[in-house]
């Protein structure tokens, strides 16, 4: 008998998270899925994207402010460059709403 994982692709994970939000269990789910270091890294990534989208600081300044390496900022910048202006605007709006 062969066993296969139930969750095989990213969309299934997104749907799992969406379902956890609908059931108000997202904090529990994300806390159980991610180690403290992973949660810290995710927080840094959100801040990197937020600062890059604001465009007020250089990559070096963002690196110093967040205590992460320039390469980490560059990866975030490269990911943003691969997205459409529409997607960047949507992300910027989400980040602004989340910070309130």
Swiss-Prot record:
Subcellular location as annotated: Cytoplasm
UniProt-annotated stretches for the region Disordered: 78-100
DNA-binding positions: 59-82
GO cellular component terms, A-Z: cytoplasm
GO molecular function: DNA-binding transcription factor activity; sequence-specific DNA binding
Biased composition (Basic and acidic residues): 78-93
Family from the record: Belongs to the TrpR family.
Name of the protein: Trp operon repressor homolog
Species of the source: Vibrio campbellii (strain ATCC BAA-1116)
